[in-house]
UniProtKB/Swiss-Prot annotation:
Residues annotated as domain Sm: 10-69
Entry-linked Pfam families: Hfq
Lineage, opening ranks: Bacteria, Pseudomonadati, Pseudomonadota, Betaproteobacteria, Burkholderiales
Cysteine disulfide links: none
Record family assignment: Belongs to the Hfq family.
GO BP, one annotated term: regulation of RNA stability
Function: RNA chaperone that binds small regulatory RNA (sRNAs) and mRNAs to facilitate mRNA translational regulation in response to envelope stress, environmental stress and changes in metabolite concentrations. Also binds with high specificity to tRNAs.
Organism: Delftia acidovorans (strain DSM 14801 / SPH-1)
Subunit structure: Homohexamer.
GO cellular component terms listed in the entry, alphabetical order: cytosol
Keywords for this protein: RNA-binding, Stress response
Protein name: RNA-binding protein Hfq
Single GO molecular function: RNA binding
HAMAP family: Hfq
Length: 83
C-alpha cells in the first residue's frame, strides 16, 4: 500500500479506535457490520461487537462513524500534511 493511503487511513482508524466510536462497516458484497474498531494493521481491521471479527480491508467498501470524528493527517505526516 502506498504511503499516501496510510496518511489518511491510519489517523482516521486510530481516532475511531481511541475514541471508541461506534462504526458501520459496509463490505463490497453489501453486508453491513457494526461495532467498534479494536485494532487494525495494513491488511485487516478488528471489529468488536458481541464477538471480535477480523475484516480484511480489501473487502471493505465504506466505514461510517456513528458520530463526528476529529482526526489530523498531521499525526502521521509530521508537519507536511499535503496530499
Amino acid at each position: 500500500m502506498s504511503n499516501k493511503g496510510q496518511l489518511l487511513q491510519d489517523p482516521f482508524l486510530n481516532a475511531l479506535r481511541r475514541e471508541h466510536v461506534p462504526v458501520s462497516i459496509y463490505l463490497v458484497n453489501g453486508i453491513k457490520l457494526q461495532g467498534q474498531i479494536e485494532s487494525f494493521d495494513q491488511y485487516v481491521v478488528l471489529l468488536r461487537n458481541t464477538v471480535t471479527q477480523m475484516v480484511y480491508k480489501h473487502a471493505i467498501s465504506t466505514i461510517v462513524p456513528g458520530r463526528a470524528v476529529n482526526f489530523s493527517t498531521a499525526e502521521a505526516a509530521g508537519s507536511d500534511a499535503s496530499a
